[in-house]
């Protein structure tokens, strides 16, 4: 169970880093938002899901 928690935290950190870089780039590029809107929403949904997963796994470990 600890390995799953560590992998979920690692995935959350990687996803956060990717979103931290990609979202401002999408907003700054001309015509970037309309062409990459689905990618940003998918990344945000993945991030929210990982936050809940880390919270659930943390409550099971502690």
UniProtKB/Swiss-Prot annotation:
What's its membrane topology?
Answer: Multi-pass membrane protein
Q: What does this protein do?
A: May control the interaction of photosystem II (PSII) cores with the light-harvesting antenna, regulates electron flow through the 2 photosystem reaction centers. PSII is a light-driven water plastoquinone oxidoreductase, using light energy to abstract electrons from H(2)O, generating a proton gradient subsequently used for ATP formation.
Enumerate the Gene Ontology biological process terms.
Answer: photosynthesis; photosystem II stabilization
Query: Belongs to which family?
Result: Belongs to the PsbZ family.
Note the superkingdom of the native organism: Eukaryota
Q: Alphabetically list the UniProt keywords.
A: Chloroplast, Membrane, Photosynthesis, Photosystem II, Plastid, Reaction center, Thylakoid, Transmembrane, Transmembrane helix
Q: Which gene encodes it?
A: psbZ
Assembly and partners are described as:
PSII is composed of 1 copy each of membrane proteins PsbA, PsbB, PsbC, PsbD, PsbE, PsbF, PsbH, PsbI, PsbJ, PsbK, PsbL, PsbM, PsbT, PsbY, PsbZ, Psb30/Ycf12, at least 3 peripheral proteins of the oxygen-evolving complex and a large number of cofactors. It forms dimeric complexes.
What organism does this protein naturally occur in?
Answer: Arabidopsis thaliana (Mouse-ear cress)
Q: Does the keyword Hydrolase apply?
A: no
Residues spanning the membrane: 8-28, 41-61
The protein here is known as Photosystem II reaction center protein Z
Where in or outside the cell?
A: Plastid, Chloroplast thylakoid membrane
> Where does this protein chiefly localize?
plastid
Show the GO cellular component annotation of the record.
Answer: chloroplast thylakoid membrane; photosystem II reaction center
Q: Name one Pfam family in it.
A: Ycf9
């Amino acid at each position: 169970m600890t390995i799953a928690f560590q992998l979920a935290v690692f995935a959350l950190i990687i996803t956060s880093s990717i979103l931290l870089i990609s979202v401002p780039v999408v907003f700054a590029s001309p015509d970037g938002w309309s062409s990459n809107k689905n990618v940003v929403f998918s990344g945000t949904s993945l991030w929210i899901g990982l936050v809940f997963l880390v919270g659930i796994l943390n409550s099971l470990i502690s």
